[in-house]
Every structure is written in C-alpha cells, then in structure tokens.
C-alpha cells in the first residue's frame, strides 16, 4: 500500500538547535534550507521548521488515561520494531521524555506503544506504534 506523505510546517525559536535535534536525535535527513527555515525528512514525511519565535507558545493539555497530553503535538506511527529502536536511541542519547515510553490498552485490539518528547522550541512530538497496524483507525 502506498501512503501519501504529509507536509507540516511548525515554528521554532532558533534554527541551529532545531537542526541538531532533528538530525542527531531523530535521524532526519536535511532537505532544503535558508536562514529562515529548514526542511527535514521525518520517516518519509516533509516537516519544515520556520524561524518564528513569537509563534512558539505553550499548549493546553488533555488527560488520556493517566497522562497529561499536550493537545498540540505531531508525530509518526511506526512499525513496532522501529518504535522500539527509536525508544532505545532516544534513551541512549539521554533525551528527556515528556511522557515515558509505555504500552496503552494492553491486551486489547488497540494495544499501542507511545512516548512523547519535546524539541528545543517546545514543539511536542509523539511516536507510537500499534501492535496490530490494522487497528489504527478502528473504533
């Protein structure tokens, strides 16, 4: 199945720390860049960090199970193996988890692994994986 790629633009406070985070921590490949923005390849999707400090604002939260989840966040649904590997990579780099890696809905059809981290501009990213990928959009 071929999946369309998404494009997401988001504000950042500063470009150099952003470049370091997305390339070194997450392993993104660099695309085009200027002195105002940087393109990244995030697991095959195009994300663009735009220098716009005034738009980097605190986000509200919602409760999901027992976690306080930022309502504004983005991320990628990975295969179980890639999710586990990314968890380990981030732990080894001593990046602070906003929400530690965990399994939600254990032993249910919608069982999923999830964790949240923040970039240097406080943009929140969630990486998750479904034990059964066919359950991503099931009710």
Where are these regions (language model features)?
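Short, structured secondary-structure boundary patches
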Residues: 52-56, 69-70, 116-123
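A short, polar/proline- and glycine-enriched secondary-structure boundary/capping micro-motif
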Residues: 58-62, 136-139
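N-terminal beta-strand motif that seeds the catalytic metal site of vicinal oxygen chelate
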Residues: 1-17, 74, 78, 129-139
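Short secondary-structure boundary/capping segments
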Residues: 30, 38-39, 63-66, 106-107
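Vicinal oxygen chelate
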Residues: 5-12, 41, 61-139
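Core segments of cupin and vicinal oxygen chelate
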Residues: 10-56
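A generic structural signal for short beta-strands and their flanking turns/coil linkers
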Residues: 4, 36, 45, 70-72, ...
